[in-house]
Amino acid sequence: MSENVVVIGGGPAGIEASRRLRDLGYIPILVEKAPALGGHLARWDRLFPDGIEAGKILDPMLQDLDGIKYFTDTEISSINRLKDTWVVKLSNGLSAQVRAILLTTGFDLFKAEKKEEYGYGIYERVITNADLEDWFKSGAAPQ
């Protein structure tokens, strides 16, 4: 097939989509704005509901990137239609003509301080699950 496909977002969904596209004969170009691939999963220690280590899911994915062009610390500068393809320009100065664009941009965590009634940001012992995961992952005890 040898057609380029841009995958925007380098979390687990973007990585897996890129791997599947590669296996189908496409040339995936994976673009992630963060300094590393993995998204939120890279920050977490354990996964609900079984408590499996996040690294046991993510690490094998990251070790299977052969044939995938990927860029970190990179954003999409522009996307323009050109007949039956797209021209995608990246913030690193590169551009690619692609057959398709796949959005796998993930999610942002809820800003808990917006709900004052929960006490987050007011009482030091009120934390979010994301805070707890950071502590578990780092091995550091909360202050």
Segments from the language model and where they lie:
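Residues forming the flavin
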Residues: 1-143
